[in-house]
């Protein structure tokens, strides 16, 4: 049987949780005393979906209590932030909740895992959740992939998005561009270039293929505009002078081939070219 994410991260299974909470007291906690989870990977909540949930709660009430823990003088949400937001929008004063004891590591893991099992996270939110799980549990990308039942390349590709400029990450969070758009921008190593192409994507409503072509064009333009490396100019000498210089060099070579050690220096002065030949008196 496939193990749940929770059990793989050293936490109780949801089914075990249900059995444990069956006998736990459901309390009515004041909305004003409840704060969101600090480790919540979801940074943007769909207001329309929250409004729909609020309407359902108005009609049927909160069927499943939220789960919280005591932190300082407040209750921090562990699971159920959407329900809490919906009830808050209804301006109700209390919400049914179960108070549990969890440390920071457990609280973060539950929040991250719960959200990873839901749909609707943006690629950046998902990448942030992976990064936090790796940090909290001291995992490698490979071991995290195994625990989540995903390919290592999937984890790696998501994490690369976190190296993009904040402007690009914000565009993903706001769903202005897709993950595939963002991955095309990764090829541009320069943040300024990435932001420039991002602007084109949004203003011109480029699709992924057009974005990839724009990235290729950016590379081509940059290459054409880059200053060409000039080859050092070879100094030109009159023909007679070149013959004389080569004759001296050949003569030195002949002497050296005879076994005699010869030291030479050449110096190009403004008015003359100087050869210095030194022949030691002693071998």
Swiss-Prot record:
Localization: Cytoplasm, Nucleoid
A molecular function GO annotation: DNA binding
Record's keyword terms, sorted: Cell cycle, Cell division, Cytoplasm, DNA-binding, Septation
A Pfam family that the UniProt record links to this protein: HTH_ParB
InterPro entries for this protein: Chromosome_partition/occlusion, HTH_ParB/Spo0J, Nucleoid_occlusion_protein, ParB/RepB/Spo0J, ParB/Sulfiredoxin_dom, ParB/Sulfiredoxin_sf
GO biological process, one term: positive regulation of sporulation resulting in formation of a cellular spore
GO cellular component, one term: chromosome
Segments of the chain annotated as binding DNA: 142-161
Predominant place of localization: cytoplasm
Coiled coil: none
Gene3D superfamilies: 1.10.10.2830, 3.90.1530.30
Recorded family membership: Belongs to the ParB family.
Function comment: Effects nucleoid occlusion by binding relatively nonspecifically to DNA and preventing the assembly of the division machinery in the vicinity of the nucleoid, especially under conditions that disturb the cell cycle. It helps to coordinate cell division and chromosome segregation by preventing the formation of the Z ring through the nucleoid, which would cause chromosome breakage.
Protein name: Nucleoid occlusion protein
